[in-house]
Amino acid sequence: MDNILNVSVILPLKTSTPKDFDEYFKKAINSLLEQKTKINELVIVHTDEEHLVHFLNSFDFGELNVSKYVWVDTPNFAKQVNFGIQNAKSEWVSVFEFDDEYSSIWFKNVKKYVDIYPDISAFLPIVVDVDEKGQFAGFTNEATFASNFTQEIGYLNHDTLHSFQNFQTSGMVFKKSLIESFGGFKSNFKLTFVYEFLLRLTYNSVRIMTIPKIGYKHINLREGSIFWNYKFGNEILSENEVKFWIDSAKKEFFFADDRQINYEPQL
């Protein structure tokens, strides 16, 4: 059908205990239901937490084609995303977070760009970052249009990433075959697993384009989220450790496999 994009949306879930989980989740799913161009499937990779399982089994997903997989190992965002991608039945995939929302025209725009630019293997949205109160906090992925960061306007390349690290893969639509060719997100990385993934793709000459339209809304530093824990929670990273993970990403993108990386505090 003309109004369907052959894409699987991958949604990893750890727990249903975060504050306002039900409300966030409903808004996230509604953003999929309201798409002008429909998706092929929603792939949910969730833990066996009792309340979460009950919530998902009783939730009304409307007309969405939903595949649910129980993750029985220790919860891990990167591993759950990779598992979802492996089980996706579409040519394209997109990583989603339960507290985020797609704009209603995002997949319509992607479908249009896929037809116009067949050599592009990944499309980034302009991301609107908001705080937990919904107040505007900034944009992400817009740096591909800044002449001081790139000579190829609208494209994310390897040189740009070495100068600027703030790019977001949630909401991005990319070919499933990229994971098969170059490896998935690396679970051994703290903080910079997204950055390392993008470095690896661009190092391998994958063409990544930013569509100059707002495509995704992301809640920045939601209490209890991965990056909130690194900054404010029980896994606070020191400045030295932050630097370590950035430097490690710049060394490990040569390797497709998820090698063991350990930070050792300086005495």
Which sequence ranges carry the predicted segments?
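Short, acidic, metal-binding catalytic loop of nucleotide-sugar glycosyltransferases
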Residues: 27-39
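Short beta-strand/loop segment that forms part of the nucleotide-sugar
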Residues: 40-49, 70-73
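Glycine-rich, basic loop-to-helix element that forms the pyrophosphate-binding segment
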Residues: 72-88
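Short aromatic/hydrophobic "clamp" motif used to bind/position activated sugar donors
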Residues: 93
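Conserved donor NDP-sugar-binding/catalytic core segment of glycosyltransferases
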Residues: 105-139
